[in-house]
C-alpha cells in the first residue's frame, strides 16, 4: 500500500495592515487606490459621489483609500507559512484575530472548503452582501490556498487541476490605451470622467475621448470603458450608443451592484455587438448567480473581495453554464493562478499602477516580492511554477499588527 502524505495542521493565523486612514497615505499594496499625488487612478474619475461637486475631482476626497491593505498569514505546525493581501485594513485585522481565528487554527492545511463555509456562515449576521467582511474572508481563503500549495510543493493553478492554455494574455486598465498598445496589451480600458449629473455634455466628452483613442490606437485594438457604478440605465444606454461608431468592445459596471433589472435592460438596449460587463463590487456567490441571469456578457469578480479563490471557482462555473465569460477584476497572482485553469477566461485584466501609465509596475507593489508582470502583454504559465502563489511578503513595509489572540 502506497504511503499517503501526512499534512500538518494550522498552528496560527495572524493579521497585519498597512496604509489607510490610520496609517501612512500612499502605501499602495493590496489597497491599490492608496496611491500618492498626481496618479491617474485619482484623476477626476466618475463615481457615485461625483454628483457632489466637492467630491468630484478626486476619489480619495470621499475616502476611497481609507481602508488600506490587509495581510493575513497562516502558519502550519511544521513552520511553513502562507499569506495573502486584500483591501480591509485595520478592521479586517480585528475580524481575523477576534472572530475567524477559531475556524482556522487546528484545522488541516487542506481543510480550505470547510474553513471557508464556516467563515461565511459565522459572519452572515454582520456581513450583509459583501464588503469589508467578505474582503477579509477572501484574504484568509487566499492565504490558505497559498499555504496548501507551499506544503505540497505545487503552484495553486495545479491544485485547481492545471492550466488549459500556455499563457495568459492581458488587456490594460489605465488612462492611456495608446501606451498599453505599445507595451503589447490586446486592449485598453479607460475610466469614464462624467456622469448623469453632467447631462448630454458628459456623454459627448467621454465619447470624444473614445474617438480620440480609436484614432491613436487603430481599428484592431480593443477599447473599453469602466464606468465604476456612476450611471443610470438611460445615461449608460445613450453613452453606449454614442461610442458604438468607435467600436467600443464593452461598457463596464455602469450601475451599482444590486440593480439587476437595470443591467438586464442595459443589455437589451445596448448596441449590437457591444458587450455589457459587471461584477467587480458584487460580494457573494448568490449575487453572481442573479447577475448571470441578467444576461450580461462577462462577469468580473474580484478574487480578493468575492469570497476568495474558493468562491471564484464557483462563479466561473455559473458563468460557464450560461455561456458567459468570467474575467476577474485585476488581482495579480491571485487571479493568474485561477484564470489559467478556466476555459471561459480567454484573456485577463492587468491594472496599471504606475502614476502616468508609462511603465510596468506590479499591481500590489510594494507589498509582494517577486510579483510577475506581463511581458509584451502576456504571462507564460512557467512563470507561475512556484509553490503556492509564488510570491513572498515584503516585511520591510510598515506592517502593523493591532490585535492578537
Swiss-Prot record:
Top-level division of the source organism's lineage: Bacteria
User: What's its catalytic activity?
Assistant: L-rhamnonate = 2-dehydro-3-deoxy-L-rhamnonate + H2O
Q: Where, by residue number, does Mg(2+) bind?
A: 226, 252, 280
E.C. no: 4.2.1.90
Q: In which residues is substrate bound?
A: 33, 59, 349
Q: Which cofactor does it need?
A: Mg(2+)
One of the GO BP terms on file: amino acid catabolic process
> A Gene Ontology MF term for this entry?
magnesium ion binding
UniProt keyword Isomerase, yes or no: no
Keywords (A to Z) from UniProt:
Lyase, Magnesium, Metal-binding
| Transition state stabilizer, annotated site positions | 349
User: Could you give the cofactor binding note from the entry?
Assistant: Binds 1 Mg(2+) ion per subunit.
What family name appears in the similarity comment? Belongs to the mandelate racemase/muconate lactonizing enzyme family. RhamD subfamily.
Quote the subunit structure annotation.
Homooctamer; tetramer of dimers.
- Extra info from the record? Reaction proceeds via a syn dehydration.
Summary of the function given for this chain in its UniProt record: Catalyzes the dehydration of L-rhamnonate to 2-keto-3-deoxy-L-rhamnonate (KDR).
The protein, known as: L-rhamnonate dehydratase
Give the source lineage, highest ranks first: Bacteria, Pseudomonadati, Pseudomonadota, Gammaproteobacteria, Enterobacterales
Amino acid at each position: 500500500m502506497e504511503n499517503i502524505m501526512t499534512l500538518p495542521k494550522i498552528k496560527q493565523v495572524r493579521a497585519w495592515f498597512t496604509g489607510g486612514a490610520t496609517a501612512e497615505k500612499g502605501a499602495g499594496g493590496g489597497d491599490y487606490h492608496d496611491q500618492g499625488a498626481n496618479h491617474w487612478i485619482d484623476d477626476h474619475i466618475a463615481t457615485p459621489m461625483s454628483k457632489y461637486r466637492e467630491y468630484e475631482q478626486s476619489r480619495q476626497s470621499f475616502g476611497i483609500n481609507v481602508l488600506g491593505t490587509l495581510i493575513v498569514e497562516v502558519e502550519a505546525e511544521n513552520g511553513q507559512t502562507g499569506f495573502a493581501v486584500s483591501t480591509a485594513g485595520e478592521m479586517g485585522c480585528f475580524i481575523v484575530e477576534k472572530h475567524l481565528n477559531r475556524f482556522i487554527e487546528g484545522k488541516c492545511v487542506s481543510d480550505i472548503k470547510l474553513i471557508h463555509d464556516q467563515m461565511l456562515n459565522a459572519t452572515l449576521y454582520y456581513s450583509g452582501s459583501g464588503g469589508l467582511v467578505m474582503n477579509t474572508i477572501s484574504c484568509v481563503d487566499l492565504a490558505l490556498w497559498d499555504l496548501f500549495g507551499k506544503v505540497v510543493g505545487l503552484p495553486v493553478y495545479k491544485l485547481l487541476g492545471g492550466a488549459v492554455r500556455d499563457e495568459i494574455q492581458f488587456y490594460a486598465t489605465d488612462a492611456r490605451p495608446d501606451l498599453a498598445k505599445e507595451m503589447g496589451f490586446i486592449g485598453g480600458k479607460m475610466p469614464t470622467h462624467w456622469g448623469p449629473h453632467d447631462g448630454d455634455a458628459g456623454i459627448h466628452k467621454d465619447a470624444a475621448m473614445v474617438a480620440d483613442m480609436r484614432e491613436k490606437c487603430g481599428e484592431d485594438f480593443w477599447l473599453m470603458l469602466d464606468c465604476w457604478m456612476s450611471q443610470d440605465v438611460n445615461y449608460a444606454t445613450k453613452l453606449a450608443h454614442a461610442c458604438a461608431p468607435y467600436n467600443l468592445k464593452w461598457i463596464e459596471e455602469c450601475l451599482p451592484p444590486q440593480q439587476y433589472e437595470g443591467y438586464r435592460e442595459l443589455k437589451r438596449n445596448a448596441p449590437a455587438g457591444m458587450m455589457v460587463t459587471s461584477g467587480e463590487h458584487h460580494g457573494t456567490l448568490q449575487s453572481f448567480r442573479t447577475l448571470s441571469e441578467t444576461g450580461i456578457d462577462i462577469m468580473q469578480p474580484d478574487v480578493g473581495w468575492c469570497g476568495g479563490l474558493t468562491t471564484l471557482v464557483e462563479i466561473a462555473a455559473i458563468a460557464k453554464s450560461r455561456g458567459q465569460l468570467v474575467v476577474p477584476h485585476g488581482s495579480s497572482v491571485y487571479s493568474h493562478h485561477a484564470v489559467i485553469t478556466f476555459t471561459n477566461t480567454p484573456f485577463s485584466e492587468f491594472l496599471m499602477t504606475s502614476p502616468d501609465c508609462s511603465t510596468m509596475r506590479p499591481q500590489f507593489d510594494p507589498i509582494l516580492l517577486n510579483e510577475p508582470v506581463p511581458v509584451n502583454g502576456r504571462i507564460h504559465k512557467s512563470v507561475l511554477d512556484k509553490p503556492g502563489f509564488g510570491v513572498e511578503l515584503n516585511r520591510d513595509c510598515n506592517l502593523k499588527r493591532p490585535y492578537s489572540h
